[in-house]
Amino acid sequence: MKQLPVLEPGDKPRKETWYTLTLVGDSPCARVGHSCSYLPPVGDAERGKVFIVGGADPNRSFSDVHTIDLGTHQWDLATSEGLLPRYEHTSFIPSCTPHSIWVFGGADQSGNRNCLQVLNPDTRTWTTPEVTGPPPSPRTFHTSSAAIGDQLYVFGGGERGAQPVQDVQLHVFDANTLTWSQPETHGKPPSPRHGHVMVAAGTKLFIHGGLAGDNFYDDLHCIDISDMKWQKLRPTGAAPTGCAAHSAVAVGKHLYVFGGMTPTGALNTMYQYHIEKQHWTLLKFENSPPTGRLDHSMCIIPWPGTCTSEKEDSNSATVNRDAEKGDSTEKGVTQGGDSQEESQADTLLCFVFGGMNTEGEIYDDCIVTAVD
């Protein structure tokens, strides 16, 4: 596995750089198909927590929950009861229960699931709510969903092996009313697939990639829930190659896509998609990229302080040398110190845990990089 620089507590992350997070405590074992969610701080807590739920290795499916306290930089095995073992499920946090984590779908060694369960982090208990309306058929899921407000949107997913479910209906679960529905959509939906990413930005849902059998897709689709019309987008720029089992997040006007698998191996690339300009950019990094991986999980976390660039680091070094010589010009003072507002700002990081390569090596590392 490639060695990345370590981002220590209190460090300012540099732009265009991948880091490893080293955390103490009861960390999860290596796994794939887990979910990764960030919960903001509650009560007197200064920083939020990352929740790693479920997953699998070649021998078993997991029903455990591990957390990272971003204030203490410690792992904790959040002993909980009631979660059915599952991997390649999805996790989401609806607006109506902002401090609870819901999971849907996935599988264990006995087959696919289509049930919903809810974690109360305070009591560390899972419940299985009674829902109404026709649910999607059991399916592996993972990144094939996205939530907007109280609603989870489901499209596609895996049925058996490399074959997706043949259903191209958009399924909607309302966490407030505990109801499944299948709204009428317009336009041509994406073809059946699994291992695609589905991410929400505003009122739009974006779907990229995935596979069916040995066919890897590189297309990008969008549906706006305000008019329920499917569109196949034709973006410009350096688009990702056909891939599956990758990850995606939305930050402001951008989508970020990382990793995945192709017919030739696992990817370690990250792409940025500008939603308004419909333009792809392959991001370049100053250091070596992380090990290529698939079936990992990714979320956005806040990191205290602003990030720096190589140019800013160089300027800071020059200022420090000038200060040692007694040069306290206005320029030097301004460049040498952060304002109080800057020091209190947070940098957003893409946080990635686990996954595997196409040779079967499974990972248990935490890697991060700053995003705009």
UniProtKB/Swiss-Prot annotation:
Cellular localization per UniProt: Cytoplasm; Endosome membrane
Protein's recorded name: Rab9 effector protein with kelch motifs
Subunit text: Interacts with PIKFYVE; the interaction recruits RABEPK to the endosomal membrane. Interacts with RAB9 in its GTP-bound conformation.
Region (Disordered): 309-341
Gene Ontology CC terms: endosome membrane
Processing and modification events after translation: Phosphorylated on Ser residues by PIKFYVE.
Biased composition annotated in UniProt, kind: Basic and acidic residues: 321-330
Gene from which this protein is expressed: RABEPK
Function, as annotated: Rab9 effector required for endosome to trans-Golgi network (TGN) transport.
Origin species: Bos taurus (Bovine)
Kelch repeat ranges, renumbered to this chain: 49-95, 100-146, 151-203, 204-250, 254-303, 349-372
Listed Pfam families: Kelch_KLHDC2_KLHL20_DRC7
Record InterPro entries: Kelch-typ_b-propeller, Rab9_kelch_effector
Entries under PANTHER family matching the protein: RAB9 EFFECTOR PROTEIN WITH KELCH MOTIFS (PTHR46647:SF1)
Coiled-coil ranges (or none): none
Keywords linked to the UniProt accession: Cytoplasm, Endosome, Kelch repeat, Membrane, Phosphoprotein, Repeat
